Amino acid sequence: EGNCYGIIGANGAGKSTFLKILSGELEPTQGDISITPGQRLSVLEQDHFKYDDCIVLDTVIMGNQRLYDIMKEKDAIYAKEDFTEEDGIRASELEGEFATMNGWEAESDAATLLNGLNIDTELHYKKMSELSGSEKVKVLLARALFGNPDILLLDEPTNHLDLDAIRWLEEFLINFENTIIVVSHDRYFLNKVCTHTVDIDYA
């Protein structure tokens, strides 16, 4: 915990593939990937159009999918006109889990991340499709950082970021208390945030 592992290497050496294997997006050709049960892994999404139909603030909170699912299920239960005793029991269970996950702070935490990355408050309730390409990148980065994940996988996180956003990200990662694995061509950035660095060569 508290370590940041930087991965460098030539284009095509397998850096991004390695992260996809760690995240479970790709199967390893040999060996196994083991993550401690209960630990949450968060990945910087590379598909900039995946959340185009979603509200910006919701997109960030989706970084903790379980928390987002609880919020949606709670809303659906409370919106029912024929609220039953079973609904009340289920709502109580969800409220307990929601509180344990600091759900009441979710929107303010998401907004703090967005503001840190210079996404204006007026954009927080717009659809992702209304944002520019660079704004989308920042929202997806905030999504990856949201909710204090146990393991954070970042593939070229400084791409398309302005200098202020890069400096903010550096400070965030330096103070991050869990495990980070980051691929970047920005050696200065890696030197700032990483406790360890590995150079991947061609197999």
Predicted regions located by residue number:
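ABC ATP-binding cassette signature C-motif
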Residues: 1-203
